[in-house]
Amino acid sequence: MKFYEYSAKEIFRAEGISTPRGGVAETPEEAERIAAELGCDVAVKSQVLTGGRGKAGGIRFASPSGVAEVTGDLLSSEVRGETVEKVLIEEKIPIDRELYVSAVIDRTAKMPLIMASAEGGVDIEELAARSPEKIVRYHINPLDEFLPYEAREIARKMGLESELIPSVGGVIWKLYQLFRKYDARLAEINPLVISGDSVIAADAKLEVDDDSIYRHREFMEMEEYEPEEFAFVKLDGDIAVIGNGAGLTLTAMDLIKLNGEPATFLDIGGGASEDVIRRALDLVISHPSVRVVFLNVLGGITRADDVARGVVNALRDARRDVPLVIRLTGTNEEEGQRILREAGIPFETSLERAAEKAVEIAKNL
C-alpha cells in the first residue's frame, strides 16, 4: 500500500519528524485559502502515487496571489499517467542543504537496511550508479533494537558537521521506528532539508506491506487503500504479465526474462470472470512503466469467452493505449477467439510465440 505524500507526512509528524506547514486542496479556492493562512510563497505539489513528479512538472512554486492559477493548471492534469485530484500546498522553506535517508527491506540480505547520503534531492538510483561511495548503507538485525547512537553513527558516516549529527541522527532513528511500527517496505525522506537550525522532511514516501494491513486497520479508512483481489507484484521491467494461476504466470515471466523484463506479476486465479479480467488489465495499464501487456490464459474453470469479453471491454475503456499480446486456449477457446477476432484483437495459441511477440514489441517501441 503506497501513501500519498500528505498522508505519509501526517504519519511522520505523529512520530516526531518535522515537515513543512501546509494543507491539502482539491480546488483553486482551497489552495488560495491555505496559502493566505501560511502568508508566504508556497510549493504546490501534485498528490500522485507515481515517482518522478518533479521532472514531470508535478511540483511548482507560487506566490499567495498566483497559487489559484497554478493549482488550476495541476488539478485534472496527468503526472506520468496518473490524474491529479489533490495538491499539497506547503510553505516554501529556505534550503541550506539537502540530505537523503530511507529505510527499506534488503531482500538479498533478508534484513532492514538504512540508506543515507549527504546528497539529497536527487534520484537515489542515479546517485548509486554514479557515486555509490556517497551512500551510507547500514543493515539492522530485525531481532535487535536499533539504538539512537547507531543512528548518530550513520549521520557521522554521511560526513556531516558535528553540530548536525544529533538532529539528523534523531530523524534517522525516528524514521526506522515508524518503518518497524507500520510494517513498511519503504520509508523515505528525499530531501531531508537543513534549514537554519531545523531539520525538515520536505518530501515523504511510505509504502506498507499489504499483508500487514490487518494489523493497521486505520489504513483501511484511507483513500489509498484498495482491497486486494489479485496476487500482484510490481517489478522493474516494461512488460506486464497476467496469468490465471501462479504456475502459468511464472512460466510466462520466465519466457519473458529470456530476452526482456517483466513489469508485473499478476495472478487472476481460477474461474476469473469477465469483470476480473477487465480490472486486472486496468490495474497494469495504470502503471506508467508498462509498455506492453502479456495475458496468458489456459482455460480450465476460467472460460476463454469470459476472458475475451473482459479484454474487449478493458481496451474500449482503457485510459491509455498499450499493446496487448494474448495467448488464449482452453475451455470455450473457439468462442473466445471468435470474440477477439471480431473485435480486431490479435491473439496467439502458442505460449512461446506469444512471449516472443511481447518482447519484440517492447524492444521496438
UniProtKB/Swiss-Prot annotation:
Binding site for ATP: K45, G52, R53, G54, E90, I93, E98
InterPro entries the UniProt entry points to: ATP-grasp, ATP-grasp_succ-CoA_synth-type, ATP_grasp_subdomain_1, Succ-CoA_synthase_bsu_CS, SUCC_ACL_C, Succ_CoA_ligase-like_bsu, Succinyl-CoA_synth-like
Membrane-crossing segments per the record: none
Record bears the keyword tRNA-binding: no
GO biological process, one term: succinyl-CoA metabolic process
UniProt pathway annotation: Carbohydrate metabolism; tricarboxylic acid cycle; succinate from succinyl-CoA (ligase route): step 1/1
Domain ATP-grasp: start-end pairs: 9-230
Molecular function per GO: ATP binding; magnesium ion binding; succinate-CoA ligase (ADP-forming) activity; succinate-CoA ligase (GDP-forming) activity
Binding residue positions for Mg(2+): N190, D203
Cofactor(s) of this protein: Mg(2+)
Enzyme Commission identifier(s): 6.2.1.5
Recorded superkingdom: Archaea
Co-factor remark: Binds 1 Mg(2+) ion per subunit.
Binding residues for substrate: N244, G300, I301, T302
UniProt keyword Metal-binding present: yes
Gene Ontology CC annotations of this record: succinate-CoA ligase complex
Swiss-Prot/TrEMBL catalytic activity: succinate + ATP + CoA = succinyl-CoA + ADP + phosphate; GTP + succinate + CoA = succinyl-CoA + GDP + phosphate
Coiled-coil stretches noted in the UniProt entry, renumbered to this chain: none
Self-association state and partner proteins as the record states: Heterotetramer of two alpha and two beta subunits.
NCBIfam families listed in its UniProt record: PRK00696.1 (NF001913), sucCoAbeta (TIGR01016)
Family indicated by similarity: Belongs to the succinate/malate CoA ligase beta subunit family.
Function of the protein: Succinyl-CoA synthetase functions in the citric acid cycle (TCA), coupling the hydrolysis of succinyl-CoA to the synthesis of either ATP or GTP and thus represents the only step of substrate-level phosphorylation in the TCA. The beta subunit provides nucleotide specificity of the enzyme and binds the substrate succinate, while the binding sites for coenzyme A and phosphate are found in the alpha subunit.
Name of this protein: Succinate--CoA ligase [ADP-forming] subunit beta
Organism: Methanothermobacter thermautotrophicus (strain ATCC 29096 / DSM 1053 / JCM 10044 / NBRC 100330 / Delta H) (Methanobacterium thermoautotrophicum)
Gene name, Swiss-Prot/TrEMBL: sucC
